[in-house]
Amino acid sequence: GLNVAANWDKINVSGPVYVGGMTKIEDGATIVGPTMIGPSCHICEGAVIDNSIIFDYSRIGAGVQLLEKLVFGRYCVGKDGDHFDLQEAALDWLITDARRQDLVEPSPQQKAMAELLGTELTQAAS
């Protein structure tokens, strides 16, 4: 897409991948096709997106790994149809709307979960 903000030398991309315009991809991200990332998304450092579809204005947090997922708004759907509401599951600090202007500070429980998963936390900001 047009006006994609990415340092392609510091991002791992393989297979057919579409990236929509105005999307920001941070260094260290990995994108494996077939994958489609809609316009105005923000893919944070170390995120892995594999065989997935990410709809417009999605923010994928640092270290998040998505395999065969469909992300739209506050919902995430797996290949088998399992789905969950990111806000209700208190995971909107990992995957959220890229247009959010507020900062979301992870709770102590979220920090502990991230430590167990080996995921580095960043504040959710657009």
What do the PLM-derived regions correspond to, one by one?
Residues 1-126:
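Left-handed beta-helix
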